[in-house]
Design a protein with these regions (language model features):
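Short, conserved micro-motifs composed of acidic
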Residues: 34, 90-91, 101, 108, ...
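Single-residue signature of alpha-solenoid repeat helices
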Residues: 40, 79-80, 115
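Flexible helix-coil transition and linker loops at the boundaries of alpha-helical arrays
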Residues: 48-60, 87-95
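Periplasmic OmpA-like peptidoglycan-binding domain that tethers envelope proteins to the cell wall
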Residues: 376, 380-383, 585-685
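Periplasmic peptidoglycan-binding/tethering modules of Gram-negative envelope proteins
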Residues: 452-579, 618, 640-643, 649-651, ...
Length: 685
């Protein structure tokens, strides 16, 4: 063959190949523009392999980026690899947005350090971008947030999930918490039909989603799951081929909401017309004779090309929250609201920057208490869609400011967490998540909030630690609680407390002084047990006060002594009808005159401190005994110092016969400050 002819043949082939790739890219771009991301991704993938890394670097980078975008928008984990391919082709020189989206994908996968770097690169060019700022901030806080934990408990609702299918957006049918619907792409036969849903979605590549329903039986178990009756007729009618008829195998249905009586359902619906996906709409269906009636489109905008979905009604049914990419929002998918006027929904408006971001806010839900719940990938979170709750700031009347809370690590984590619903006014319900799913299948989880339990428990003893089995407790609370009961035989007690209450507890026992404790259960976020052991001082004998110290030969109180005396202040306040003798004692060193004078001054210093802190002077008698009343050893002291016999008086004769080290111990024991009750009828008569 002539070499010239061969050259021109090869050149023609190359030209035809190039033209073919260009046409395929244009076709993929069109599919991307109408939201058929899965189909577009396949086309971009085939084009990428046909382009040269040198000659077609820019175009190859564009194709890889668009492929990554397709995967990102349908939460396909292959997005990260596509973005890496685009970066190798220097696509960032064309559009730095790749750093933002790559950061989102990496965060979605739990690769927080890499995500933070990607966000930083994007912020270099766009320092004021909220989504990038939120993403970077979240990546730095993940470990801290995980440690905070959450009171909510979750578990997979296995009865609703099916292997290799997605199941999401559970919703109770109005106030009936024994009936539930959810979206699923499982391949079930319609009731009374023979066909299965086979046609995959051009958007996600998964089978089409339909609305399924289930109910609880008398035993409280969820019964067999079946297609929502009346919304599916198993095939495509002639009318549905050319109209927006909601019945038929090509239609896709999803997130729904109900009026409180369960008779009206609003749901998300999407159906291709003439082979083209025109986006989602919201439809209404009324229930009669056990089946859902012919759905009718809910008009929210004059422009019929605007996509709307994810309806959520408030408790009164006069406000509709929904999701749209309509002009006037913050970008991406935003949450909007409209008001009911007769049969029409009017005054559609976005919720504003407190809720919406340039990313996506979806799956709104309004709790019975008025709290708004939704999913977002634009606010600080764990990656992908996170669940948030929002309440209006009540600082100002009619405020439009929202206070936002991330639902925490029980709900949120790597992947998407979304589509929450509650059982009436409780904090129990269901939500959707693809956590731990490598292929991204959504599952339904149940959640519940355990009741917070507050307990007061402890032991009532004498000052030596012996249980007082005949002690009594009186509990008074700011909520009206006023209870009196005996401790157990072993001196212990235990009782439940209420939330947001201030408590006072008084312990009494014959022959002993009272003891009082105060505490509260205000602003607690988790269960708590208060352990309060009370030691009651005897009335009949002196009580040694520990940790009362003075400088050598001085009577001024040290800081440690003042702290100990504050306990005596409290005891006198808890027992307002007693008077006491407060006595100070010295060791055997020094003259009698010196020790008597020193001990009297020390006793007076203690009384002066008590008077300074509000104790009446008439209730106090300071006495300095010097060294005239040495300690007599009891069983408790003998247990600590076995070499001191029980009933032994630590007098000068006994001490001088001991070795020097033991003499010093005895001197320390004799150096003490005590009090004893003199009267128990102060101001009673």
């Amino acid at each position: 063959m002539n070499w010239h002819k061969l050259f021109y043949i090869l050149l023609a082939i190359l030209c035809l190949t190039g033209c073919s790739v260009q046409r395929k890219i244009k076709r993929a771009d069109k599919k991307f523009a109408i939201g058929e991301y899965y189909t577009a991704a396949d086309i971009y993938k085939s084009c990428y392999g046909q382009l040269s890394a040198k000659k077609d670097r820019e175009l190859k980078g564009y194709v890889a980026y668009r492929q990554g975008e397709c995967y990102r928008l349908i939460n396909n984990p292959r997005a990260a690899n596509a973005y890496q391919s685009a970066l190798r082709c220097k696509y960032q020189l064309q559009d730095s947005t790749i750093f933002l989206h790559a950061g989102q994908v990496l965060q979605y996968q739990g690769k927080y350090k890499d995500a933070a770097k990607s966000y930083e690169l994007y912020l270099e060019a766009h320092p004021d971008n909220y989504v990038a700022q939120a993403g970077k901030y979240a990546c730095s806080k993940i470990d801290e947030w995980k440690k905070e934990g959450s009171r909510y408990k979750i578990s997979e609702a296995k009865e609703f999930n099916q292997r290799r299918t997605s199941n999401f957006a559970p919703m109770f049918i109005g106030d009936n918490t024994d009936a539930l619907v959810f979206a699923s792409n499982r391949q079930e036969k319609p009731k009374g039909g023979s066909k299965k849903l086979q046609r995959p979605s051009n958007v996600t590549g998964q089978q089409l989603f339909q609305i399924y329903q289930t109910r609880k039986n008398a035993a409280g178990e969820w019964e067999e799951i079946e297609l929502a009756e009346g919304l599916y007729d198993g095939g495509e009618s002639e009318q549905s081929k050319d109209s927006a008829d909601t019945k038929g195998g090509t239609a896709e249905m999803g997130v729904c909401t109900f009026t409180r009586d369960g008779r009206t359902m609003l749901f998300t619906y999407s159906k291709p017309i003439n082979g083209q996906d025109l986006g989602a709409k919201i439809y209404r269906s009324d229930r009669a004779s056990g089946e859902w009636g012919e759905p009718q489109e809910v008009k929210l905008f004059l422009d019929s090309s605007i996509t709307v979905g994810h309806p959520a009604l408030n408790v009164t049914g006069d406000t509709l929250y929904f999701v749209s990419d309509a002009p006037g929002g913050e970008g991406g998918k935003d949450i909007w609201m409209a008001e009911l006027d007769g049969e029409n929904w009017l005054n559609a408006q976005p919720l504003g920057k407190g809720i919406n971001t340039a990313a996506d806010e979806m799956y709104p839900y309004v709790h019975a208490d008025g709290t708004l719940y939704f999913a977002s990938n634009g606010h600080p979170g764990y990656g992908g869609l996170d669940l948030y709750k929002a309440t209006r700031d009540t600082t100002f009347k009619d405020s439009t400011v929202w206070v936002l809370y991330n639902m925490g690590p029980s709900f949120n984590g790597v992947g998407d967490d979304f589509g929450i619903t509650f059982e009436g006014e409780t904090q129990n319900g269901f939500f959707s998540s693809n956590k731990g799913e490598k292929k991204g299948y959504d599952k339904i989880y149940r959640f519940w909030l355990p009741e917070m339990e507050f307990i007061a428990e402890g032991l009532v003893t004498d000052e030596q630690g012996n249980p007082l089995s005949d002690a009594q407790l009186r509990i008074v609370g700011s909520d009206g609680t006023n209870s009196k009961f005996n401790v157990r035989r072993d001196g212990t007690y235990k009782f439940k407390l209420n939330r947001e209450v201030k408590y006072v507890m008084l312990a009494t026992c014959r022959g002993h002084l009272n003891a009082k404790e105060q505490w509260n259960t205000l602003n607690l976020k988790d269960s708590k047990t208060y352990t309060m052991n009370l030691a009651l001082s005897p009335i009949s004998r002196p009580v040694k006060m520990e940790n009362i110290f003075y400088e050598f030969g001085r009577w001024e109180l040290t800081q440690a002594s003042e702290t100990e005396l504050l306990h005596l202040v409290k005891l006198l306040e808890d027992n307002p009808n007693i008077t006491i003798e407060l006595s100070a004692h010295t060791d055997m060193k020094g003259t009698d005159e010196f020790n008597n004078d020193l001990s009297q001054k020390r006793a007076q210093s203690c009384c002066d401190f008590l008077i300074k802190h509000g104790i009446e002077r008439e209730r106090l008698t300071p006495v300095g005994y010097g060294k005239t009343k040495p300690v007599i050893c009891d069983k408790a002291l003998n247990k600590k110092y076995p070499w001191i016999p029980v009933e032994q008086e630590l007098n000068e004769v006994f001490i001088t016969a001991l070795p020097d080290d033991k003499q010093e111990i005895c001197n320390q024991i004799n150096r003490r400050t005590e009090f004893k009750v003199v009267k128990t009828t102060y101001k009673l008569y």
